[in-house]
Design a protein with these regions (language model features):
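Long, contiguous binding/interaction regions
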Residues: 1-83
Length: 83
């Protein structure tokens, strides 16, 4: 099956779902090339987390992960496809 290289950008506004996010990412670990997480304290506001996931996977796996992340409260994501 053909695979694609993608970057999944994730913003975590509500840390209550972070354990579920980590469980999802663990389920797709075979496709994940790398992961970078950055905590960020917004001026006068709460902390958010910015996470970048590089992955190579079939498009159905990419869509499935993105859809599952999108169902988590307080967490948003976007997928950018290479080429």
């Amino acid at each position: 099956m053909e695979t694609r290289i993608v970057l999944v950008g994730i913003i975590v506004n509500d840390r209550t779902e972070i354990s579920r996010l980590n469980e999802l990412l663990s389920q797709y670990q075979d496709y994940i090339i790398g992961r970078m997480g950055l905590p960020h304290h917004m001026h006068g506001e709460k902390e958010i987390s910015i996470i970048s996931i590089a992955m190579e996977a079939p498009t159905d796996k990419i869509s499935a992960l993105s859809g599952k992340i999108g169902m988590l409260k307080g967490i948003s994501s976007k997928v950018v496809y290479a080429g």
